[in-house]
Amino acid sequence: MGLSEAEWQLVLHVWAKVEADLSGHGQEILIRLFKGHPETLEKFDKFKHLKSEAEMKASEDLKKHGHTVLTALGGILKKKGHHEAELKPLAQSHATKHKIPIKYLEFISDAIIHVLHSKHPSDFGADAQAAMTKALELFRKDIAAKYKELGFHG
């Protein structure tokens, strides 16, 4: 399941593009998540009232949360699979406080792949998409194991 060094380099190359605009990428990813899977919006008291894409695009809170999500994910990706320290508090909050099912992490992973491909087609070809998909699967597998340790079966 681990990634090769070459795969990690593909992931981190496109991630550098994301970091140039974490808020913009994050907002677009969350909008795609919420539009594709409206049930996920119910987990966010702060955003439940946002019904249209225009409202979502106008929300500074959504933009800030997108920045927060991608900052955390970037920190995990940069650890190249050695993300235990970063993952533990994230799993704790998502399992016990927010109660985010693993399925929702699959949904946001799909949104990430889609947005990166649409925004960076020349840097996110088939090899990079496969590497990012693998990295996100590793993240989900490891967070699911933490969920299980915490007794959360979301």
UniProtKB/Swiss-Prot annotation:
SUPFAM superfamilies: Globin-like. The modification Phosphothreonine is found at T68. PANTHER family: MYOGLOBIN. The gene is MB. Heme b binds at H94. GO terms for cellular component: extracellular exosome; sarcoplasm. Its EC number is 1.7.-.-, 1.11.1.-. The keyword Nucleotide-binding does not apply. InterPro entries: Globin, Globin-like_sf, Myoglobin. The keyword Cytoplasm applies. Residues 2-148 form the Globin domain. It is found in: Cytoplasm, Sarcoplasm. O2 binds at H65. GO terms for biological process: removal of superoxide radicals. It comes from Indopacetus pacificus. This is Myoglobin. Its main location: cytoplasm. It holds the Pfam family Globin. Belongs to the globin family. It comes from the Eukaryota. GO terms for molecular function: heme binding; metal ion binding; nitrite reductase activity; oxygen binding; oxygen carrier activity; peroxidase activity. Monomeric heme protein which primary function is to store oxygen and facilitate its diffusion within muscle tissues. Reversibly binds oxygen through a pentacoordinated heme iron and enables its timely and efficient release as needed during periods of heightened demand. Depending on the oxidative conditions of tissues and cells, and in addition to its ability to bind oxygen, it also has a nitrite reductase activity whereby it regulates the production of bioactive nitric oxide. Monomeric.
